[in-house]
């Protein structure tokens, strides 16, 4: 098995993964995100600000953030609108006609 050890000056203790993530958040990354992890992996200095100095649960796990930073997501196309939506848009938009007050078919001429 693997254990995680936290060392601060002369103090050392074993920590679980959740506590390790909060400690990393508190001491090394101010609200690390996918981009912060990616930058850290590339060797860039990462800094930012967080309102929760003790860490918080909204920070994703370091393992998840590192994985998402390394794997590029597939680009997905948005779904096509329904036929109903397409026909609503087509029929509800006013048609512009040059120099006429109304359509000939609407006037009965």
From Swiss-Prot:
Residues 68-81 are annotated as: Multimerization. GO terms for cellular component: host cell cytoplasm; host cell plasma membrane; membrane; virion component. Keywords: AIDS, Host cell membrane, Host cytoplasm, Host membrane, Host-virus interaction, Membrane, Metal-binding, Phosphoprotein, RNA-binding, Ubl conjugation, Ubl conjugation pathway, Virion, Zinc. Processed in virion by the viral protease. A motif (BC-box-like motif) lies at residues 61-70. Residues 75-109 are annotated as: Disordered. Required for replication in 'nonpermissive' cells, including primary T-cells, macrophages and certain T-cell lines, but is dispensable for replication in 'permissive' cell lines, such as 293T cells. In nonpermissive cells, Vif-defective viruses can produce virions, but they fail to complete reverse transcription and cannot successfully infect new cells. Vif-defective viruses show catastrophic failure in reverse transcription due to APOBEC-induced mutations that initiate a DNA base repair pathway and compromise the structural integrity of the ssDNA. In the absence of Vif, the virion is morphologically abnormal. This is Virion infectivity factor. It comes from Human immunodeficiency virus type 1 group M subtype B (isolate SC) (HIV-1). The lineage of its organism: Viruses, Riboviria, Pararnavirae, Artverviricota, Revtraviricetes.
């Amino acid at each position: 098995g693997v254990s995680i050890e936290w060392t601060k000056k002369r103090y050392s203790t074993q920590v679980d993964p959740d506590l390790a993530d909060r400690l990393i958040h508190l001491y090394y990354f101010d609200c690390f995100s996918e981009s912060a992890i990616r930058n850290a992996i590339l060797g860039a200095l990462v800094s930012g600000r967080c309102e929760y100095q003790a860490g918080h649960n909204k920070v994703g796990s370091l393992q998840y953030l590192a994985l998402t930073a390394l794997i590029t997501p597939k680009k997905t196309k948005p779904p096509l609108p329904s036929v109903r939506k397409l026909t609503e848009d087509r029929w509800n938009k006013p048609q512009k006609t040059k120099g006429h007050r109304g359509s000939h078919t609407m006037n009965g001429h």
